[in-house]
Amino acid sequence: MARVKRGVVARRRHKKILKLAKGYYGARSRVFRVAKQAVIKAGQYAYRDRRQRKRQFRALWIARINAGARVNGLSYSRLIAGLKKAAIEIDRKVLADLAVNEKAAFAAIVEKAKASLA
């Protein structure tokens, strides 16, 4: 059986890693051994941050809703309690968008929440 030399396979593997590391600084984009570590680490960061993004957006939405609610004389927690009592099911993403872009509509929702709390 003929001996298989690994040149083609190794070259392909190196090119793949170096392509993924394109745009990295210095040796991280040029040296295979360093680039491989950088690509692995980047993948770990990407995996972690896909999960963190969901938490960060929820926190941002809550901060925006809280700011809008306080302008209308209610705290975030009281607003959410009022919405639950009034059986208004609007998610935080939409509420935050209303608080920022549609202040009148948000104020109307806050008033309904206030009425259900009274």
From Swiss-Prot:
Decide whether keyword RNA-binding is in the record: yes
Q: Which GO molecular function annotation, any one, does this entry have?
A: rRNA binding
Q: What GO terms fall under cellular component here?
A: ribonucleoprotein complex; ribosome
Q: What GO terms describe the biological role, i.e. biological process, of this protein?
A: ribosomal large subunit assembly; translation
Q: Which domain of life is it from?
A: Bacteria
Write the protein's name. Large ribosomal subunit protein bL20
Read off the InterPro entries from this record: Ribosomal_bL20, RIBOSOMAL_L20_CS, Ribosomal_protein_bL20_C
Function, in words: Binds directly to 23S ribosomal RNA and is necessary for the in vitro assembly process of the 50S ribosomal subunit. It is not involved in the protein synthesizing functions of that subunit.
Family the entry assigns: Belongs to the bacterial ribosomal protein bL20 family.
NCBIfam families (alphabetical):
rplT_bact (TIGR01032)
Q: Name one Pfam family in it.
A: Ribosomal_L20
Under SUPFAM superfamilies, the record lists:
Ribosomal protein L20
Q: Which UniProt keywords apply?
A: Ribonucleoprotein, Ribosomal protein, RNA-binding, rRNA-binding
Gene3D superfamilies cross-referenced by the UniProt entry: 6.10.160.10, Ribosomal protein L20
